[in-house]
Regions:
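Aromatic-rich peripheral "rim/lid" segments of glycoside hydrolase catalytic domains that contact
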Residues: 282-291, 450-500
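Active-site-adjacent substrate/metal-binding segments within catalytic domains
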Residues: 50-199, 214-264, 309, 313-316, ...
């Protein structure tokens, strides 16, 4: 039996809860401080009439000190009526998945040597290079920490890149995470070296890029109106489509093309197609240079509508035009350079993920619509997620989500979009609650936790936050790991439960 409290290289002041995770064929044990649930009720919002006994969890969108908490009913596997986990040991899990963490028990599909998407009986899936159905469960930002204690811990625990990545791959896979997401700065090539040396235990990659800023720099353009909020307007500038093709065919992508371990790529992050306080059409019309291509496009759009008054509907339509011009150029370039490389979109966030025009454009050209999903305790199964399915016949991937514990962390937690919760316990419950909702959604093909390791030191302008699966001594958070493992190990079985 392996206990997460037994590591002698743990940070001396770190006191994890008493969590015991079974190794091999030994079953894990629930922690003694598992909260007592309420009476059995029907889970909402839901696509199914499933009953559960909720626990009450506190959370806040504020940074500490938290003066007022909200509370929300929260669903965890232990208290789901009518469901018992099918997989309770590491050995059973390893026997049920392949090297990518894909199911070896669900019906096999055509093996193409690459990842692709497929809709089967109304549910979207990823299919891995071996033809196995795959639910994506990965972590973003796999990179070395830069603080002094990060460096000391890394040298003490690993010492070499080879040991770091082989250890990390093993530890992550043993809690059901099998790959990496965006922002693995300085690590992508190291991951590929690891994969080449360890073909039976790879880490998948989903590299992220910054097409708009790279295009601006390559062409010596300025942002429309001098503001990076208007970066999307660069798609109206000369050479956008041609540059996308040359960029994809160039050195930035050379290592990823035709690599079977590359899930796909993100071309940008959180493009500002609009926000609650700033509509893209208003911004482009406010550009003082009347010859700026972004202004010209916005003015021509308004003229075609015969009005000078911007409405939300007009803004949504125009944002869709901008998004389509963006996504079309990238996708057409992908088809010419490597037509089997999945295009994962641009990690829509905030307002844009709720804009029909933007989501329709993404669905038309992206293989997967990526969503950075914050500011919601539960997935919006009957509203936004249903809209995404109606607006775009494509699957979605949650490319970021997390919570941060603020009462048992040594970080100031003054940054980040993820909710604040009191402790690591609530982080664990939130993980299961949110991902259970995602598993109900037949258009969801997985998620990327943000992120691999906590911030530290000067990260985020010296406002580091508890975002990681790992702490700053390169140790997994035991409580979060336990509950993530239970969910991840049973993800395929839970899909069958929800789809029955």
């Amino acid at each position: 039996m392996v206990s997460c409290t037994d590591d002698d290289d743990k940070e001396p002041n770190f006191m994890p809860p008493d969590i015991v995770m079974g190794g091999g064929d030994v079953e894990s044990e629930y922690p003694e401080d598992l909260p007592a649930p309420g009476a059995s009720v029907m889970y909402t919002p839901s696509l199914n009439a499933n009953m559960y006994r909720p626990i009450s969890v506190k959370y806040s969108s504020a940074y500490p000190p938290i003066s007022s908490w909200k509370t929300e009913n929260t669903r965890i596997i232990a208290y789901m009526d009518g469901y018992k986990p099918a997989i309770k040991t590491l050995k059973a899990y390893q026997e049920s998945v392949n090297k990518y963490g894909s199911s070896t028990t669900l019906p096999k599909q055509a093996a193409t040597g690459r990842f692709y998407t497929k809709k089967i009986d109304g549910r979207w899936w990823l299919v891995d290079p071996e033809g196995c159905l795959h639910l994506e469960r990965s972590a973003t930002s796999l990179r070395k920490g830069t603080s002094s204690r990060n460096k000391t811990a890394w040298n003490s625990r690993f010492g070499t890149d080879e040991k770091w990545l082989s250890t990390t791959q093993r530890e992550l896979s043993e809690i059901g995470f099998h790959g990496t997401g965006a922002f693995c700065t300085g690590t992508y090539s190291l991951i590929q070296t690891h994969n080449a040396s360890n073909p039976s235990s790879p880490l998948t990659l989903a590299p992220s890029f910054a097409f708009l800023s790279q295009f601006k720099s390559a062409k010596s353009y300025s942002y429309p109106g001098g503001s990076d909020d208007n970066a999307a307007g660069l798609v109206f500038y000369n050479g956008w489509s041609e540059w996308c093709e040359s960029y994809l065919a160039g050195s930035a992508f050379a290592d990823y093309l035709r690599d079977p371990n590359v899930l796909g790529f993100f071309s940008d992050n959180e493009i500002n197609f609009s926000s609650n306080s700033s509509r893209i059409l208003d911004r482009f019309l406010a550009i003082s240079n009347s010859s700026d291509p972004a202004y010209v496009a916005a003015k021509a759009f308004m003229d075609s509508k015969g009005t000078q008054s911007v409405t939300d509907d007009l803004n949504n339509e125009f944002a869709g035009i901008v998004a389509e011009k963006y996504y079309k150029a990238v996708k057409e370039a992908v088809k010419k350079v490597d037509d089997k490389l999945l295009y994962l979109g641009t990690r829509l966030h905030g307002t844009p993920k709720y804009m029909e025009g933007v989501v329709r454009a993404a669905g038309k050209y992206c293989d997967v619509i990526s969503i950075n999903y914050y500011s919601r305790w539960s997935p919006e199964l009957t509203t936004a997620i249903a809209d995404w399915a109606n607006w775009a016949d494509k699957p979605f991937l949650v490319s970021e989500f997390y919570t941060k514990g603020v009462e048992d962390s040594d970080l100031n937690n003054q940054s980040g979009a993820g909710y604040s919760v009191p402790t690591q316990n609530e982080r664990a419950y939130a993980y299961q609650h949110f991902t259970l909702g995602l598993l109900e959604a037949k258009n969801c093909i997985g998620w990327h936790w943000f992120k691999y390791q906590d911030d530290d030191g000067t990260d985020n302008s010296s406002k580091p936050a508890n975002k990681g699966l790992y702490d700053n001594s390169y140790q997994l958070f035991p409580y979060l790991s336990f509950f993530a493992r239970e969910l991840n190990f049973n993800a395929y079985d839970l899909i069958q439960y929800f789809d029955k």
